[in-house]
Curated annotation (Swiss-Prot):
The lineage of its organism: Bacteria, Pseudomonadati, Pseudomonadota, Alphaproteobacteria, Hyphomicrobiales. The keyword Cell membrane does not apply. This is Ureidoacrylate amidohydrolase RutB. Hydrolyzes ureidoacrylate to form aminoacrylate and carbamate. The carbamate hydrolyzes spontaneously, thereby releasing one of the nitrogen atoms of the pyrimidine ring as ammonia and one of its carbon atoms as CO2. It holds the Pfam family Isochorismatase. The active site is at 23 (proton acceptor), 132, 165 (nucleophile). Its EC number is 3.5.1.110. Disulfide bonds: none annotated. Belongs to the isochorismatase family. RutB subfamily. HAMAP family: RutB. GO terms for biological process: nitrogen utilization; uracil catabolic process. The keyword Hydrolase applies. It comes from the Bacteria. NCBIfam families: RutB.
Length: 228
């Protein structure tokens, strides 16, 4: 199938393609989650969730593999790194808990509501879940092995945040020789609106391809349907 994309169309074989859902957790998209508590605007997250659901429904119907990234750490935050790690200094979740000690153990800790995937996008049978502890879903995970074992070469990225974990993962995919596509209306940024456009520009010009949910769903719906 040929996907209309920028800067040029890209051909994707469904059996060699996966949709990668980046960090669609309560932490990043729900009122009362870490991102909301840290002061970021999450008002666009509801629309993002709806567009991701549309994407996943179409992908599963066509037999395209769905892979979830889930970001966070153990309840004691050992995996987050201590003061010797730049993550300790830059993670807004960790900084928020240091400012508000009453939140300690609640933000991005495995097993908590904050860490959980949002109700609307719960993984389905056959989907793959890849836990991660840093922005990129390729760092210290089995993601590369998961993809190579299945002959997957093309990755369609959706999720939050466009300019952090989505872009970090797509860049690493590029460096590992994967073809990365970002569905711009199925991602949401953290920060001013121009941040979204900056990532779109980076992906389009340097690291991959940019497309829309409607274009992806329109093309993938023409693939042979999955039969039992």
């Amino acid at each position: 199938m040929t996907l209309p994309a920028r800067p040029e169309p890209i051909t994707l074989k469904p059996s060699e393609t996966a949709v990668v859902v980046v960090d669609m957790q309560n932490a990043y998209s729900t009122e009362g989650g870490y991102v909301d508590l840290a002061g970021f605007d999450i008002s666009g997250a509801k629309g993002t969730i709806a567009n991701i659901k549309k994407t996943l429904d179409a992908a599963r119907a066509a037999g395209v593999q769905v892979i979830y990234f889930q970001n966070g750490w153990d309840k004691d935050y050992v995996e987050a790194g201590g003061p010797g790690s730049p993550n300790w200094h830059k993670s807004n979740a960790l900084k928020t808990m240091r400012k508000r000690p009453e939140l300690q153990g609640q933000l991005l800790a495995k097993g908590t509501w904050d860490y959980a995937i949002v109700d609307e996008l719960q993984p389905q049978p056959g989907d793959i879940l890849v836990p991660k502890t840093r922005y990129s879903g390729f760092f210290n995970t089995n993601m590369d092995s998961v993809l190579r074992a299945r002959g997957i070469r093309n990755l369609v990225f959706v999720g939050i945040a466009t300019n952090v974990c989505v872009e970090s993962s797509l860049r690493d995919a590029f460096h590992l020789e994967y073809f990365g596509v970002m569905l711009e209306d199925a991602t949401h940024h953290l920060g001013p609106d121009f941040i979204q456009q900056a990532t779109v520009y980076n992906v389009e010009k340097f690291f991959g391809w940019v497309a829309t949910v409607n274009d992806f769903c329109g093309v993938i719906s023409q693939a042979a349907p999955v039969t039992d």
